[in-house]
Design a protein with these regions (language model features):
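N-terminal targeting or signal-anchor segments and their processing/structural boundaries
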Residues: 1-186
Length: 188
């Protein structure tokens, strides 16, 4: 059942390509809302392997607006995306607010960190998505060597756009009591 006043995003990432030459239509997503407003904020960054700093493709990146320290093991993410072949990610259509961000190699696909074999990454601080209206240069070429026109165009830049997460596997060990020690004190 759809939630009222909620933005939903279908993220095709790199799954659409043309029929003849197999050129990939990258980063395509479709958003719709059950209310009058479509949330439009974005955050982006890169996910690296903590051991060798190699990019990690195909890993789920998620946001939690519940800032409790145990939310990532109890609740599913409120917004998600996946990393591309270069470990890059963008989470789109975010509601304004404060979030914790996580990366999760989600073995059982429940959008929670709940299996000993799942890799995880996180920031130790919160993120607050924002934007600024700015300009950039756009070049029109006559051919591959000759510039026709350089125009200044406006665009929206979203922040943070340089998040770096490092994925690691938690060393899961059972805790055992090695040596019990009881202390008794007498009233003074």
């Amino acid at each position: 059942r759809d939630r009222p006043n909620t933005t939903y995003t279908i993220d095709f990432t790199n799954s659409i390509s043309d029929n003849n030459e197999k050129n990939v239509f990258e980063n395509f997503s479709f958003a719709f809302s059950t209310g009058d407003i479509i949330d439009t904020l974005e955050v982006s960054g890169v996910l690296l392997n903590a051991e060798n700093l190699e990019p990690m493709p195909g890993i789920t990146i998620g946001l939690h607006n519940n800032l409790e320290d145990s939310a990532f093991v109890k609740l599913p993410f409120v917004r998600t995306s996946r990393t591309n072949d270069k470990g890059q990610f963008t989470i789109r259509n975010i509601t304004p607010g404060t979030y914790h961000i996580f990366a999760l190699n989600d073995v059982n696909r429940d959008y929670k960190f709940d299996q000993p074999g799942e890799d995880i990454a996180f920031l130790d601080s919160v993120i607050v998505p924002s934007f600024e209206l700015t300009t950039r240069q756009d070049t029109t070429w006559k051919d591959s060597l000759t510039i026709d026109t350089i125009r200044t165009v406006g665009y929206t830049r979203f922040f943070p756009d340089n998040i770096e997460l490092r994925l690691f596997k938690e060393k899961f060990e059972r805790q055992y009591m090695v040596k019990p020690c009881l202390l008794y004190t007498s009233p003074s």
